[in-house]
């Protein structure tokens, strides 16, 4: 289900109406949008041509990640409380680390299995054949769950923040599940931090004219980027050139490359604008994701302006824990290389 589709409009209007109609009943309101988010996720996961049904386990993986991080963070917090109450701090720290490890391994194992299993099987086949063996690895029929990187990073950062003592775990499983699967940003971001989102769930929502105006403006802005600019560039120019590049001059191919950079920006930032606008109509503020990246003066500034919620996530949960810019003269470059390598993977 694409944002820029009539199907999404038919989905969103009843959800919006139910959300505000149930504003005096927080539990029911949250449960309705939580169920709607799962429906949206499954509908968005269906192949565009409809040739295959959406695997049922897509929703199961999302639920598993939610339950895993809810349980792990609760146990981490309870162990920290026991240590403060006089329990053996070393034993508590060891057990807290084990629960954090369970969250990290559980989440990243699923992400790695679906994204890289066939990649490594094919690589092993190529290496074996290069060494003279006739072994051929099986190709697994795996469909990559849509948005798995985004919701994995989002739920994992919650557990890490609890482990660091920066966040008190959410006692309500319903609200935590809502945070993980909130449909406007579930499929392609922005990646939301629990410290920014969960406090908004503990405030009774108010339908304000400011939110309506901003929400509608961001949706309109995103649709113009996505449909008028991004889709038009693809249909009218870039796809045509890339289909038969040998039929065009070097200048036309170069223009197509520049056109494609504009196309992917319009697609991605347009989607983020719509997500921000839809969330705003529901009374939630989620972070900006793009800040005019093509006006950056260098690559470092471009990185900070493009998909900002991902770049800050990688900085806070990968680059800094590796040591950041500290250490020997070569260490910062290794940390940066490893971060970029993992991003590319």
Residue ranges of predicted features:
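Membrane-embedded transmembrane alpha-helical bundles that form the catalytic cores
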Residues: 1-345
């Amino acid at each position: 289900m694409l944002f820029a589709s009539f199907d999404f409009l038919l989905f969103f209007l009843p959800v919006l109406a139910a959300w505000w109609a149930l504003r005096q009943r927080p539990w029911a309101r949250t449960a309705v949008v939580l169920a709607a988010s799962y429906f949206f996720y499954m509908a968005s996961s269906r192949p565009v041509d409809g040739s295959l049904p959406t695997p049922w386990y897509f929703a199961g993986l999302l639920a598993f990640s939610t339950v895993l991080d809810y349980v792990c963070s609760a146990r981490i917090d309870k162990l920290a409380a026991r240590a403060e109450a006089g329990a053996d701090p070393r034993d508590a720290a060891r057990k807290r680390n084990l629960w954090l490890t369970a969250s990290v391994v559980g989440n990243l194992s699923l992400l790695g299995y679906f994204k890289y299993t066939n990649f490594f099987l094919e690589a092993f086949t190529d290496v074996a054949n290069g060494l003279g063996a006739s072994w051929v690895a099986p190709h697994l029929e795996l469909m990559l769950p849509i948005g798995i990187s985004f919701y994995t990073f989002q739920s994992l950062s919650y557990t890490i923040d609890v482990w660091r003592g920066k966040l008190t775990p959410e006692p309500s499983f319903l609200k935590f599940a809502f945070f993980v699967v909130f449909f406007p940003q579930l499929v392609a971001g922005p990646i939301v931090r629990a410290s920014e989102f969960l406090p908004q769930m503990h405030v009774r929502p108010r339908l304000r004219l400011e939110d309506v105006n901003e929400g509608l403006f961001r949706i309109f802005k995103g649709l113009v980027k996505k449909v008028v600019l991004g889709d038009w560039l693809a249909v009218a120019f870039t796809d045509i050139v890339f289909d038969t590049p040998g039929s065009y001059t070097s200048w036309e191919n170069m223009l197509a490359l520049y056109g494609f950079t504009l196309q992917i920006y319009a697609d991605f930032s347009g989607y983020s604008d719509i997500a921000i606008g839809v969330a705003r109509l529901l009374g939630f503020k989620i972070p900006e994701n793009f800040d005019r990246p093509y006006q950056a003066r260098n690559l470092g500034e471009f990185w900070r302006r493009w998909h900002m919620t991902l770049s800050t996530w990688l900085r806070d949960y990968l680059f800094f824990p590796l040591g950041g810019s500290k250490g020997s003269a070569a260490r910062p470059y290794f940390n940066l290389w490893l971060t970029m390598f993992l991003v590319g993977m």
